[in-house]
Amino acid sequence: MAVPPVTELTDRARAIFQLVVEGYLESGQPVGSKTLSQEQSLDLSPASIRSVLADLESIGLLAAPHTSAGRMPTETGLRLFVDGMMQVAEPTRAEREAIAQRLKRSGPIEQALEATSSMLSDLSGAAGMVMVPSREPRLAQISLVPLGQGKALAVLVGEDGAIENRVIETGDTPAHVLEQVSNFITARLAGRTLAEATAAMRKEIADGKSALDTASQNLVERGLAVWTEDAAERPVLIVRGQANLLDESALEDLDRVRSLLDDLENKQSVAELLETARDAEATRIFIGSENRLFALSGSSVIASPYRDREGKVVGVLGVIGPTRLNYARVVPMVDFTARSLGKLIG
């Protein structure tokens, strides 16, 4: 159903509609005319309120559950409220400082992403989601440092100063050969991504143009493979706080919650949904059936892209929960968290 403009509602209808939505988002329960009649700002009789509620229901903004005499917003109604009536509650100074400090203490980027997902879950009372950055950094050099007992520490340095290391098996390879292999790889990976460097070196070896002997060529393969395999196994999505979805109201609708938890297990599909927010200028809000993945579970997703220091979008983060999320609070919180995480991305 198309969302009617807010301006088409009378002042009375707009006021009652807003009170119903805000009451529902706060309590998770339908709001009745008796409750509304106690609002001093309305100064209307229960009969007048019931008449307006019926009108709002007839145009698809409210619905009356069979188990209650009250009304709750439909997905169409929630969209109208979010787009035209919601007053966002910006994070307080204390909340902003807490977010920044928690991210600073998180350590390497992988830990920062996990901390971000957990933090979004804690702040929203829903499940937090963070897509792992899809970017491939340019590399500067690799060093193979002998450790003894047939092992070496492979140290990979990026142009942005990031350092990663892995232990690889080297057999009885002498130290001077490790240095030769390090120089060979460094000369060919500088300024390239790992994928670009790997393709170039493997082609050079396959074409017989490499000056390395067979043992050294095998060592090159092992040195590259340890990162290639590791990258392939990295998760595309980090989800935390699924337990938040099992609140008291969830017990009344276990089928919906079970469907939502099943959907969250399909992380590739969730990541594809978040990808649709990658090019968004601002935080995106998907309400209920507006996204196909979570349509059956009646859930909402709030997502925002996060950028590196150069302003390039490298991932998306957000929260997912029931459609009665506190949008006014969660939307600016997701936006601020995305900007804070971006400051940590090189």
Swiss-Prot record:
A molecular-function term among this protein's GO annotations: DNA binding
Entry keyword set: Repressor, Stress response, Transcription, Transcription regulation
Domain of life per record: Bacteria
BP term (GO), one: negative regulation of DNA-templated transcription
Cross-referenced Gene3D superfamilies: 3.30.450.40, Heat-inducible transcription repressor hrca homolog, domain 3, Winged helix-like DNA-binding domain superfamily/Winged helix DNA-binding domain
Signal peptide: none
Function: Negative regulator of class I heat shock genes (grpE-dnaK-dnaJ and groELS operons). Prevents heat-shock induction of these operons.
Family in the record: Belongs to the HrcA family.
NCBIfam families, per database record: hrcA
Protein's recorded name: Heat-inducible transcription repressor HrcA
Gene this protein is translated from: hrcA
